[in-house]
Amino acid sequence: MFRQRTIQNLVRTTGVGVHSGRRVELTLRPAQPNTGIVFHRVDLPQVVDLPAQATGVGDTRMASVLQQGNVRVSTVEHLMSALAGLGIDNLHVDLTAEEVPIMDGSAATFVYLLRSAGIVEQNAPKHFIRVLKPIEVREGEGRNEKWARLEPHEGFALAFSIDFRHPAIDSTANFAEIDFATHSYVREIARARTFGFVNEVEALRSMGLARGGSLDNAIVMDEFRVLNSDGLRYDDEFVKHKILDAIGDLYLLGKPLVARYVAQKSGHALNNQLARALLEQQDAWELVTYESQAEAPQAFRHEWKLA
């Protein structure tokens, strides 16, 4: 059968929160089958557990934030994206502050950590959410219109369009399509960094956001150009980072999707609305397992091979 996965060994790192600017220690621990991904705020007098669930998202300003009462875990999307890309179902995530560290602004460090810990299969079938009919969410009008859609597809594919009307971004591709039957998450998506604009920093920091942002963990632009001396990692790094985010946001459904995601100018808020809309329309999806690797769509066999 196509089995669930966790990591073999505990792994730990430290970093800063891109929004809080606070130092945080991150510990990733193996978890039993059917646990899912669970975040733990171990810095509090009593540890608070926050399961990685779309319905647990309480804030989507510049990040996906899990919330339980007054307790938050912010900026979960890059780690969730890495877990989705590597096919990891079960994991305990311990944090000593309210934000997952930003690392280099991509998912690459998390991919490295998870692979270093060793990825192992477990004696339990992996469950997938197979989309049976299209689900779409929209907001805005005209040039401000944003939308995101899930539609049936035997595998996992994403297509994304962006429109920032900025010379540095417009000089790159504003559209990308990734089908994991033929594309590699690790090689083609994981290294895409988050990005921001110098002229927005002051306003964001006054809102308690972007306090840990720097050229070390983001692509930063002035009015005309990219300020990072090393330039871009991919020719289409901007739109690929939006795909990276979407993969992480959608993995808050708790299981990998058998579907195609198509979006225009979507972000964390719309992605979360889409995930919730899918869960609410129960005739639009079904849970499936695969008796063997050979039965599963190529998208899941292509990169989830264990050494």
UniProtKB/Swiss-Prot annotation:
Its cofactor is Zn(2+). Its EC number is 3.5.1.108. It is an enzyme of class 3 (hydrolase). The keyword Lipid metabolism applies. GO terms for biological process: lipid A biosynthetic process. It catalyses: a UDP-3-O-[(3R)-3-hydroxyacyl]-N-acetyl-alpha-D-glucosamine + H2O = a UDP-3-O-[(3R)-3-hydroxyacyl]-alpha-D-glucosamine + acetate. GO terms for cellular component: membrane. Keywords: Hydrolase, Lipid A biosynthesis, Lipid biosynthesis, Lipid metabolism, Metal-binding, Zinc. Zn(2+) binds at H78, H241, D245. The active site is at H268 (proton donor). It holds the Pfam family LpxC. Pathway: Glycolipid biosynthesis; lipid IV(A) biosynthesis; lipid IV(A) from (3R)-3-hydroxytetradecanoyl-[acyl-carrier-protein] and UDP-N-acetyl-alpha-D-glucosamine: step 2/6. GO terms for molecular function: metal ion binding; UDP-3-O-acyl-N-acetylglucosamine deacetylase activity. Belongs to the LpxC family. Catalyzes the hydrolysis of UDP-3-O-myristoyl-N-acetylglucosamine to form UDP-3-O-myristoylglucosamine and acetate, the committed step in lipid A biosynthesis. This is UDP-3-O-acyl-N-acetylglucosamine deacetylase. It comes from Bordetella avium (strain 197N). The lineage of its organism: Bacteria, Pseudomonadati, Pseudomonadota, Betaproteobacteria, Burkholderiales.
